[in-house]
């Protein structure tokens, strides 16, 4: 059986000559760094991080993988920061007798 590798998103498929079709082979996923680049530790880490178990549903995968993507984490941080800013901004200031909003006519 000859294997042809191709990347499709994060999934890795292999082609079987016997069955004449592509199928997801989870065993090759952790070995992906060996195929892509020899001795590149970064790509191995990335592959392990995005390891997909075939039994997980697509929604579950999307949820967990999205959390781990660096740009997503950055976005999440930005959102929480914005939320904090908004809540602190909208909180009414304690008004002292010296600082009151001016309602009279000039």
UniProtKB/Swiss-Prot annotation:
GO terms for cellular component: mitochondrion. Residues 38-106 are annotated as: Disordered. Keywords: Mitochondrion. Residues 57-71, 82-96 have a biased composition (Basic and acidic residues). It is found in: Mitochondrion. A stretch of 270 kb of the mitochondrial genome is duplicated within the centromere of chromosome 2 resulting in the duplication of the gene. The expression of this duplicated gene (At2g07673) is not demonstrated. This is Uncharacterized mitochondrial protein AtMg01030. It comes from Arabidopsis thaliana (Mouse-ear cress). The lineage of its organism: Eukaryota, Viridiplantae, Streptophyta, Embryophyta, Tracheophyta.
